[in-house]
Amino acid sequence: SVAKSAQFPLHVWLPDAMEGPTPISALIHAATMVAAGIFLVARLLPLFIVIPSIMTGIALIGIITVVLGATLAIAQKDIKKNLAYSTMSQLGYMMLALGMGSYRAALFHLITHAYSKALLFLGS
């Protein structure tokens, strides 16, 4: 889940996926690839809620990913890499919401992020 949704320790593949054509980048970053990890954690959330240390770990990974993604997005000159790191930061917010136990907020953010980021990629 951490690798699939480009969270903190395993986030290095995300900007390199921007080398392809724009419609493929929009599909990867908005709908399918990065959403799968968040959706997996959301589906397994009833199991994770039982153990508070797992929830704390999920929230901590989310916080680190938010800060790292936003910082790396500020430093980019390429618009596609900027959007990739922005996606990483937004996925960190979703992971943080799941770590705090807010299933609905995380899935709402996932759906709205998919639409807005797909339009941003197609417009870049």
Curated annotation (Swiss-Prot):
GO terms for biological process: ATP synthesis coupled electron transport; electron transport coupled proton transport. InterPro entries: ND/Mrp_TM, NU5C-like. It is a multi-pass membrane protein. Keywords: Chloroplast, Membrane, NAD, NADP, Plastid, Plastoquinone, Quinone, Thylakoid, Translocase, Transmembrane, Transmembrane helix, Transport. Pfam families: Proton_antipo_M (PF00361). Its main location: plastid. GO terms for molecular function: NADH dehydrogenase (ubiquinone) activity; quinone binding. The chain crosses the membrane at residues 22-42, 44-64, 91-111. GO terms for cellular component: chloroplast thylakoid membrane. The keyword NADP applies. NDH shuttles electrons from NAD(P)H:plastoquinone, via FMN and iron-sulfur (Fe-S) centers, to quinones in the photosynthetic chain and possibly in a chloroplast respiratory chain. The immediate electron acceptor for the enzyme in this species is believed to be plastoquinone. Couples the redox reaction to proton translocation, and thus conserves the redox energy in a proton gradient. NDH is composed of at least 16 different subunits, 5 of which are encoded in the nucleus. Belongs to the complex I subunit 5 family. This is NAD(P)H-quinone oxidoreductase subunit 5, chloroplastic. The gene is ndhF.
